[in-house]
Amino acid sequence: MTDELIHVHDQFYIVSTSARLDDRTRVLKHGDTFAVFDRSGDIEAPGPPELGIYHQDTRFLSRLMLRLANKRPLLLSSTVKEDNALLTVDLTNLDVPHNDEVVVPRGTLHIFRSKLLWDAACYDRLRVHNYGRANVDLLFEIEFDADFVDLFEVRGVTRAKRGRRFPIELNDGVLEFGYEGLDRQVRRTSIRLDPLPVGLFDNRIHYRLELPPGGYATYQFAIQCELDESRSRSTIVRPVLIYEDVAGVAAAALRAVTSAEPEIFTANEQFNDWINRSIADLHMMRTETEYGPYPYAGVPWFSTVFGRDGIISALECLWFDSNIARGVLSYLAATQAEKENAEQDAQPGKILHERRGGEMAHLGEVPFGRYYGSVDATPLFVMLAGAYHERTGDDQFIESIWPNIERALLWIDKFGDLDGDGFAEYSRRSPRGLVNQGWKDSQDAIFYEDGELAEPPIALSEVQGYVYAAKCAAATLAPTLGKKNFGDQLADEAEQLRRQFEEKFWCDRLGVYGLALDGRKNLCRVRTSNAGHCLFTGIASEERAGRIASALTEEPFFSGWGVRTVAAGEARYNPMSYHNGSIWPHDNALIAAGCARYGFKREAANILAGLFESSLFFDLHRLPELFCGFPRRPGESPTLYPVACSPQTWASCAVFPLLQACLGLAIRDHHHEVVFRSPYLPQFLPEVQINRLRVGRGSVDLTLTRHETDVAVDVVRRKGEVNVLVLK
């Protein structure tokens, strides 16, 4: 058979018949560990550069390949189960020749492979079944390697020097790889093998596969990621290879989480698939920290704490699971900056942007060990605190983080407003930090109408909305803590900001708020999705909200799949760019929530429809971090963005605010109320059922049914004190 790879002049070429042409990947994650495999469950080079098993921003396994008789098995099927806990793969053999004769025909052997991740270990089980009528005697080989490169190296950052690798060893059925980094930390990959191999050749283990007709054999290995700064090699804890026990523990942990959540069903099975995958992605990205659950941002590039991403994800799913918001607030309060540090872009009261734990971060080769370079995370933190309190009525928790809220508000006024003009701005202080520090943080994301890049300090339109909403939220919280005068002051400041924002940011020619003010207070007259966030936060005027909502949900903003980050026709518009014309699901979700806030339910439903219909084309019904903003073409799918994270938590969580926006759903814990304000359901959603929706100590089961001119809300079951209000 022709080799899949051709090597010419130090370049690899893939033949047109190779399975390598399919670059779709499979992702597993648990805690601080994640894995990216090809669809066969392997880690192969050359292949997508992100393939590997990673722990705390380091790749602990860079190669994992199965071979039968020196050939890769043929892929039959591959999927990640609906709950994201298990990757299953079906493989078979290719023809095995011997002396010009095929001794094992293609399709004789079935390999069922299942993989799961738990507690910094990957468990891999292979069951090989002989469906032939003759004995099989083959060489079965598994190749491993561990390069221990930092995640930033995988992303393309080069290093002048690296640490040292240890020799590969096989002891008592455990294959060991080791590396001592320049940070003096020893990182090890220990692979426990069952059964014991017949031999080790370089980094390849060999088995003799001998099966009678109808016979089968099982092979298991556990790949453990270990960080070891002080222990000797003899004291390292080996992974316990009991696959069924690990699977049982993982299933029990998932049941504990899901039992506390609502159930959502609709009359549209495809919509249910999208919801179920989104919920599973939220479960997978939810990571237990010492401060509670935190949704890591995305796999593979952002599987860590991000302030902005965590807050927005928590806001998106707040009605569904308020525990995540509490965990996010706790974590960010504990890591709030206490002093100025230019290298970290930190000032007192500022909320964390990003935290990293790899070798390069430890050494300061990248500034992201603990980095504060975002202008919006701090007001978003206060916004989330207010929203969490409204959802839960958790006075005690809000009181515990009130000092952090006060410090965040002080940062907004003292450090966030760089020139005293009343607007929050950014201008990086770290020479290695982010140039742009809003959610659109690409270097070319903030520009004038002629395409020239804007000069800092930059005051983003949506950030003023976040500050407005933060002060409104704190103004509501303050009286509950006996600080009514402070609350009144904050309310006055919010109203003053709203009037000033209207005067400086509105552009009548564009029909939306401008993108930003530059350092000389010139307006960047560019049509961007940022204006939709001004609807979301409520800073937009009632008189202009309708014009904005209409503009965002029509061309040149709306592609048919969603709202573009930059309208078609603008100077830097490019539907294939990261921030200048692509479509981001979380961005669309906040825009839809903003449209609904001002009563524009049909516009919100149009956004919901576009993203739902796009989900039908994406692998596993999973919305990626972003996709390209090309116009929708009949009979064609959305165009993928090649390096988008998938899953990305705030993209996966987009379904929650989209559905909430259409339903007009609000939960007011202090009043024991579930409120539906002018509920609206699009034609493809004739019925929505929500069970176990918790309000305080009570819960309620609800069914919403679409009629020609109305939506009926029926209470199916009520437990405890829960009032359901429908406002039309």
What is each residue range found by the language model?
Residues 88-94, 103, 260-305, 330-372, ...:
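Extended glycan-interaction surfaces of carbohydrate-active proteins
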Residues 166, 177, 385, 467, ...:
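The core hydrophobic/aromatic register in alpha-helical repeat solenoids, strongest
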Residues 129-134, 459, 474, 481, ...:
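A generic structural motif
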Residues 303-435, 461-464, 468, 491, ...:
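Aromatic-rich carbohydrate-recognition surfaces in CAZymes
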Residues 282, 286-290, 314, 336, ...:
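Structural motif corresponding to the C-terminal cap of alpha-helices
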Residues 234-249, 273-277, 321-335, 395-413, ...:
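Extended, well-ordered alpha-helical scaffold segments
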Residues 1-279, 283-284, 288-293, 298-304, ...:
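Terminal accessory carbohydrate-recognition/targeting modules of carbohydrate-active enzymes
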Residues 219-220, 280, 379, 383, ...:
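Generic structural signal for well-ordered, non-membrane alpha-helices
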